[in-house]
Amino acid sequence: MSTIEEKRHSLAHLLAQAILNIYPEAKLTIGPATETGFYYDVDFGTSKLTDQNLPKIEKEMKKLLPTWDTFESISKTADEAREYFKDNTYKLELIEEIISRGEQLTFYKSGDFIDLCRGGHVAHMNEIPADSFELDKTAGAYWRGDEKNSMLTRVYGLAFESKEELDVYKHKIEQAKERDHRKLGKELDLFTFSDLVGGGLPLFTPKGTAIRNAIIDKVYEIQGEYDTQEVCIPHITKPDLYKTSGHWDKFKDELFHVHGRENEFVMKPMNCPHHTQIFASKPRSYKELPLRYVESTMVYRDEQSGELLGLGRVRSITQDDGHTFCTPEQIDQEVKILISIIKKFYTLLGLMKEGNYRVSLSFRDPKEPQKYLGDESVWETAQAALTRIAQEENLPYEIFEGEAAFYGPKIDFMFKDAIGRERQLGTIQLDFNMPSRFGLEFTDKDGTKKTPVMIHRAIAGSLERFLSIAIEHFAGNFPFWMAPVQVALIPIKEQHEQAAKDLHKQLKALGIRVDYMNSNDNFGKRIKKAKDERVPYFIIIGDKDIEANKVTLESRDEGQLGQKSIEEVLQLFRELK
C-alpha cells in the first residue's frame, strides 16, 4: 500500500495534466506533496486563474483518474530532455541544474503525461479514492521563491486517505476561519493596521494593550521568583555590534537602516548582542554567576510584504527575552529553572497537559563536528545534561540530531491548540559561540579567566505571534487573568448606579479591569455587548440586589451564579487574579 505522501505527489501529476488539458499554453514548473495535500506552480501566461476556475480543473482531474494506472520511469538523455521541454524555460532551468550537479535526469509517465520528477508515486492510481481529494485555493508564488523572478499561480489541493479524513480536516479549517485572530482581533477591538503606518506594524488598542500587559506581567511574576534582573537597551545600534556577533552576514538584508548625522545605525533585530555588552561592562567573578538578564522589548525585521500575516508575522516584534550567563557547571540548574518557568506559564494557559505537548531536543550532528563551534566535550556535556533534565522533568522528548544551531543545542516546546494545530512556543537555547566572539570572561575559583555559557530563552516568545495563537486557541474567550475586560458592571436602572459606582471603586482598587456600563443604554443591549466581548464575569445590580445588599453574578463559562455578597465577589476575584 502506498503512503499518503506518495498519493499526494501522484495527485500533483494528475493536477498538472488536468491544467494542460484545459490551458494548453500553461507552463508547468514544480509540484510537490504537502502536509495536507499537494500543489503545482504554473505560469498561465496571459490567462488569469482564480478560485472560480478550480471546480473545472478538479472535474477534469476526476475524469482523468480512472484512465491512469501506474507510474512508469522514463529515460531521457540531456539532449532529449532539453528537446522535450524546449518551450518551458522553467523545466529547462531545472534540467541544467540537475546536470550541473552530476545527477541523473529522471522522468515519470502516467496516462499521457510525462514530467521531470525524482519519483515517489503510488503503485497504482486506483489506490486513490476520487472523493478523497479536492482542489482548495490559488495563490501567487514567485519562481524559486525569489521576488526577482516571475510571479506564478500556485494551485493547492487537499488529499487524505479517505473522504472521512478529508471532511474532518475541512471541518478543522472552518473552525480555524472562525477563530482567525485577524477576524477576532477586529471584532474584539484588540489591534489594527494602518496603511499610513505600514504593513507588519500593528497598532494595539486599549483592550489589546491590556492583554499584552497581562501576558508580560505574568511572565515577569513567574520568572521573578528566580532572581532575574531586568535590563533595558536602546532600539538602535552601530552595525559593528552585529558584525562582531556574526549576525550581520545572516541578517543584514532584513535590517532597517538608520542614517544619523555622523554614523550609520540599524534597528535591532535581536537583543542578545546588546546584553553581552552589559555583562562586559565590568570585570566579573564566578561569585556573580549566574546572571539572569530579562527584558520585554521590541525588535525590528524587514520582512518581505508577502510574508506578513496579521500578528503571526510582523516587522515590529515584542520579545519576552532573557539571557543567562553562567558557568558550564551551572547549565543543569539554569535549564531546570527555565523549564519550571515555562511549565508554570503554560499550565496557566491549560496547555501543559499530557498528550498536548512535546519537547524537541535539537543536537549537533556527530558525523559533522566541524559544522559546530565550541569544545566537543562541552557539547557532549550539555547535550547529556539536556537529555537527563528532560528525563528528570518527565518531558515527552525526542532528539533531533543535526538540528542544533552552530553555536549550541536547544529545547523547543511544541503545544497543540484547541483545534489540534501544533505550535512552537517556549524555547531554551545554549550558546557557546557569542560569549567567545565578544571576549566575555569571568574570573573562576582558581583565579583563571573563563568564558561563560550564554543561555537564550523565550517564554512567550514574540508577543505578537503569541497573541495571535492565544486569540485563536481561546477563540477570544480569554482566561480571567488575561482578559482585556475581566468584569462587566451593569446597573439595571439609574437608581442602581450609585451602588454600582461604589463597587466599581472597590474592584479598581483590587486591580480588576472593569467595564462600567451605565444605564444610558438599554439593559438588554448592555448584556449583549458584554457577551459579544467575551467578558468572563458580569455583575448585575437591581432592586432586589440593593435590598439584600448583594449583587447578581454571572459567568461567561459557568452561567448564572446567583446572588453574592460584595465580599464574596471581591474574594472570588482576588483568587482568580
Model-derived segments and spans:
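NTP/phosphate- and nucleic-acid-binding module
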Residues: 1-29, 34-577
